[in-house]
Amino acid sequence: MATGTVKWFNDAKGFGFITQDGGGEDVFCHHSAINMDGFRTLQEGQKVEFEVTRGPKGLQAQNVRSIP
């Protein structure tokens, strides 16, 4: 599992990007990859844990969850 910080997330469009703690390419995050009940969203600056996969347009986050 990778960790990072939410760079930005657009609720209206349902996606955003996560900056990895280890550096490297920012990771795309779609709302469907967020593990939480109710409305799936992330806040700028929020710390998260996630799996990284390579999608057709670059790195994608899967199984995203908030960490303290």
Curated annotation (Swiss-Prot):
Gene Ontology CC terms: cytoplasm
Domain CSD span(s) in chain numbering: 4-64
Principal location listed in the UniProt entry: cytoplasm
Pfam family, one: CSD
InterPro entries: Cold_shock_CspA, Cold_shock_domain, CSD, CSD_CS, CSP_DNA-bd, NA-bd_OB-fold
Sorted UniProt keywords: Activator, Cytoplasm, DNA-binding, Transcription, Transcription regulation
Gene3D superfamilies: 6.20.370.130, Nucleic acid-binding proteins
Subcellular location: Cytoplasm
Molecular function GO labels: DNA binding
PROSITE patterns (alphabetical): CSD_1, CSD_2
Keyword Membrane: no
The organism's place on the tree of life at top rank: Bacteria
Protein name, as recorded: Cold shock-like protein CspA
Taxonomic path: Bacteria, Pseudomonadati, Myxococcota, Myxococcia, Myxococcales
Gene: cspA
